[in-house]
Amino acid sequence: MSDRLTLLRPDDWHIHLRDGAALANTVGDAARTFGRAIVMPNLVPPVRNAAEADAYRQRILAARPAASRFEPLMVLYLTDRTSAEEIRTAKASGFVHAAKLYPAGATTNSDSGVTRIDNIFEALEAMAEVGMPLLVHGEVTRAEVDVFDREKQFIDEHLRRVVERFPTLKVVFEHITTGDAAQFVREAPANVGATITAHHLLYNRNHMLVGGIRPHFYCLPILKRNTHQEALLDAAVSGNPKFFLGTDSAPHARHAKETACGCAGCYSAYAAIELYAEAFEQRNALDKLEGFASLHGPDFYGLPRNTDRITLVREEWQAPASLPFGDFDVVPLRAGETLRWKLLEAGA
């Protein structure tokens, strides 16, 4: 078993960098590993058009570490009022690479999201025409639907219909959490792909709920039972190009997580590729990591692969108990615990 693993530099096809003072921390953590990242638009207010995307992009670029070539790939936040013209303008910008469907109320800062899928059909038609992928948070939000069933319900009620109605539209089913979602993506046409997070590969709902509630495992879509975790691992290590890396790294200040009504999100960007390496090693599939992390994503988006490389070494190190997050701190995934792989920094 090798103690070194060299990969083409990976990209993160789903990340939350937040805004303001937090960018000084989140951008550096992402840029340490990734060449590019699809940046989620659920700010307050959300990123709804090309002008707002450009302003956010400039704030991210200003926060890059010195000499970093990290490239933020911007995303529009779809609303009931997103027009075809806004889609075309965004595509023409060259820096907006996708548009995101948040069902209203599904997750953090999604209150401005889509209330009925039919309301965005005009925008989806334009996206199919110009070649802009649709990114989907795939959960229904009706109160009577159990939180553990909301992803499957979304597939049955909405996603099948969207894929059938817009056969040329690229669709990324983001942060899939169930065997149902993995099966749907496998069986769907080639224009449908999915991202999988490190935390959904490494953990299941027992980790969050057994022996006490652990708020830093709480995320949306929520961790599912271990059979779904195993199905996600099967998909990730399969070599199927429909599945690729998307951390959904989503930081919240400690006080917003460790509270009676805590926010959803796990912060993994600080050690993302190391965490994925652990998951793939569990399946004796480190040889499949480069495809999942570095090849499948750019191929799906029609972007060039990165040409530089990173190296991981088998070396134990302790994850920090907390990290700076703007004016506060964030408790990262695996805080205070031992990680088994370490990114070899440039020049080391």
Curated annotation (Swiss-Prot):
Give the co-factor note.
Binds 2 Zn(2+) ions per subunit.
SUPFAM superfamilies named among the record's database cross-references: Metallo-dependent hydrolases (SSF51556)
Q: Which UniProt keywords apply?
A: Hydrolase, Metal-binding, Pyrimidine biosynthesis, Zinc
User: What domain of life is recorded for the organism?
Assistant: Bacteria
Which GO biological process entries does UniProt record here?
'de novo' pyrimidine nucleobase biosynthetic process; 'de novo' UMP biosynthetic process
Any Pfam family from its record, for instance, is: Amidohydro_1
Is the keyword Metal-binding assigned to this protein?
yes
Chain positions recorded as Zn(2+) 1 binding sites = 14, 16, 100, 248
Any one GO MF annotation of this record: dihydroorotase activity
Provide one Gene Ontology cellular component: cytosol
Name the EC number(s).
Answer: 3.5.2.3
Positions annotated as active site in the UniProt record: 248
Cofactor(s) essential for the protein: Zn(2+)
Keyword hit for DNA damage: no
Q: Which residues carry this modification: N6-carboxylysine?
A: 100
State where substrate binds.
Answer: 16-18, 42, 137, 220, 252, 264
Family matches, as CDD domains: DHOase
Reactions that this protein is recorded to catalyse = (S)-dihydroorotate + H2O = N-carbamoyl-L-aspartate + H(+)
Q: Which InterPro entries does the record associate with it?
A: Amidohydro-rel (IPR006680), DHOdimr (IPR004721), Dihydroorotase_CS (IPR002195), Metal_Hydrolase (IPR032466)
List residues binding Zn(2+) 2: 100, 137, 175
Which NCBIfam families has this protein been placed in?
A: pyrC_dimer (TIGR00856)
Q: Subunit structure, per the record?
A: Homodimer.
Q: Report the protein's function.
A: Catalyzes the reversible cyclization of carbamoyl aspartate to dihydroorotate.
Q: Which PANTHER family match?
A: DIHYDROOROTASE (PTHR43137:SF1)
Q: Which family does it belong to?
A: Belongs to the metallo-dependent hydrolases superfamily. DHOase family. Class II DHOase subfamily.
Q: What is the name of the protein in this document?
A: Dihydroorotase
What phylogenetic lineage does the species belong to?
Bacteria, Pseudomonadati, Pseudomonadota, Gammaproteobacteria, Pseudomonadales
